Curated annotation (Swiss-Prot):
Keyword entries, A-Z: Developmental protein, Nucleus, RNA-binding
Major site of localization recorded for this protein: nucleus
Protein name listed in UniProt: Protein held out wings
GO biological process terms, semicolon-separated: apposition of dorsal and ventral imaginal disc-derived wing surfaces; axon ensheathment; cell adhesion; cell differentiation; cell migration; germ-line stem cell population maintenance; glial cell migration; mesoderm development
Domain named KH: residues: 142-210
Induction remarks: By 20-hydroxyecdysone at the onset of metamorphosis.
Keyword hit for Membrane: no
Gene: how
Tissue spec. comment: During embryogenesis, expression is seen in mesodermal precursors of somatic, visceral and pharyngeal muscle. Later in embryogenesis, expression is restricted to heart and muscle attachment sites of the epidermis. During onset of metamorphosis, expression is seen in muscle and muscle attachment cells.
Pfam families reported for this sequence: KH-I_KHDC4-BBP, STAR_dimer
Amino acid sequence: MSVCESKAVVQQQLQQHLQQQAAAAVVAVAQQQQAQAQAQAQAQAQQQQQAPQVVVPMTPQHLTPQQQQQSTQSIADYLAQLLKDRKQLAAFPNVFTHVERLLDEEIARVRASLFQINGVKKEPLTLPEPEGSVVTMNEKVYVPVREHPDFNFVGRILGPRGMTAKQLEQETGCKIMVRGKGSMRDKKKEDANRGKPNWEHLSDDLHVLITVEDTENRATVKLAQAVAEVQKLLVPQAEGEDELKKRQLMELAIINGTYRDTTAKSVAVCDEEWRRLVAASDSRLLTSTGLPGLAAQIRAPAAAPLGAPLILNPRMTVPTTAASILSAQAAPTAAFDQTGHGMIFAPYDYANYAALAGNPLLTEYADHSVGAIKQQRRLATNREHPYQRATVGVPAKPAGFIEIQ
C-alpha cells in the first residue's frame, strides 16, 4: 500500500471517529435536556403538593354562635378601653388634636362593627348626582303597638342615650323622631300637652317620623333607605334572642362605666384561685399530725393583698429597763408534747431571752455595789448655807481632833 492510500484510510477513520463523537454528544445533550425537563416537572409537582392550602378567613356569617359571642365581647372590651382613653384625653383639651381625631374615628369604626348583627355589614349609601332644587320630604312609619303591646319599641329604636337613632341618622342622612301616643317618657307631661299647639302628634298613634332635606332624586333614595332600616327595628324578637338589645345594653354599660372587662375578670378569677390554693396549703401545714400544738399556738394566717401570706407572731413585751431584765422570771414551758418523738424544745422569745436564760454576768452585777447601777447619797438634814459642805456616812470626829489642812 502506498503512502497516499494509507493517508486516505487514516483520514477516513478519523472522520468516522469524529462523526461518532458528534452523534454521542448530541445524544448526551438530548438526554440531559430530557432529564432536566423531568426534574422540573417533578419539582413543580412537589411544589403543588406541598403548597399551603388557601384558607378563606371565616366571616361573621360563618362563625358559630359561641364564636360570635366571643367576637362581640372582644369588640365591647376594645370599645370600653377606647372610651376610657377618650375620657382621660379630655383632661388635655386642644393639645393632642390628631390623637383625638384618630381616637374618635376608631371609636366610630368599632361601634359600627359592634352593631353588625349576624355579620351583616352596612354598606355606605350610594347617592346620585344632585338634580334640581332642595325639597323636604317626610314619611311616617307606624309602630305595631296594638299587635305587640308589651314590647318596648321606643327603646329599641332610640337605643342607649339615643345612640341607635343617631347612628341611623348618620347612615341614612335623615332625621328620625319618635312621635305619637306613648312617645314621651313622662305620661303626665304628655297628657298635659295633648291638644296644644306644636303637640298635635300626641293625638296620633305611635309612629316614627322620618324627615330629609335634599334634592328630590337624592331625598327619595335616603328616605327609602331610612324606612327600610326602621322597619327592621320594628320586628319584635323573642326574649333572650334579641341581639340588638344585648348590644344596646352592653353599650349602655360601657357609657355608664359599669361594664366589666372580661380580661380584668379573668385576672381576678386567677388571683382568687391562687389565694385559695395558698390558704389551703397553709391550713394543711398548720394542721399537720407531726406538730399537734402548733395550730393552737400560732394564729391562722390571712392572705396578704399584694404577696405571699405572712405569719405574724403575737405582740411581745420587750424589756427596756435593767430591773425588768434582772427580774427573776422562769422560762416558759415546752409547747410541744415530747412523747413519741423525743424532741426537747423550749420556745424562748428572743427579745426577752436574756432575762429568761438567767445570764450569770447580769446577776453578778446585781450583787455588788460596784456594778452598773450607781448608789445615790441622800442628805438627812438641810444645809444651813448654800456653800456648806455636807458629809454623808462619815463617822463623827473624836474630841480633841485637829484637822490639818
